[in-house]
């Protein structure tokens, strides 16, 4: 849980990976209080960016895409990952 008041902790650009997942969708509106620009990333489609947001579809296993994703980012909330509990095809279903 974020416990520091947004008025004292503010980043220019904050990156949220795994933004299309359950936790990412829950944190998306809350994290906007902690930054001027919230950069959202996932390999799955994301809803369109709203004011103060950037959306970037990225495969985290692609080094060049990740380096581009991190450009001018001050902080990262990393929720992106691949499920090991189920085969990838079942996770996507």
Q: Residue ranges of each PLM-predicted region?
A:
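Conserved beta-strand scaffold positions in the cores of enzyme catalytic domains, especially
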Residues: 40, 54-56
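Short, well-ordered alpha-helix to beta-strand connector turns
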Residues: 11, 35, 51-53, 73
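Short glycine-/acidic-enriched loop or helix-start segments at secondary-structure transitions
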Residues: 25-27, 50, 87-89
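NAD(P)H-binding glycine-rich loop region in Rossmannoid oxidoreductase-like domains
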Residues: 53, 60-93
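N-terminal Rossmann NAD(P)H-binding glycine-rich loop of SDR-like oxidoreductase domains
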Residues: 2-34
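Short, solvent-exposed loop/turn segments at secondary-structure junctions
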Residues: 20-22, 45-46, 82-83
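Conserved glycine-rich Rossmann-like NAD(P)H-binding loop of the short-chain dehydrogenase/reductase
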Residues: 36-47
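SDR active-site strand-loop-helix element
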Residues: 17, 41, 76-80
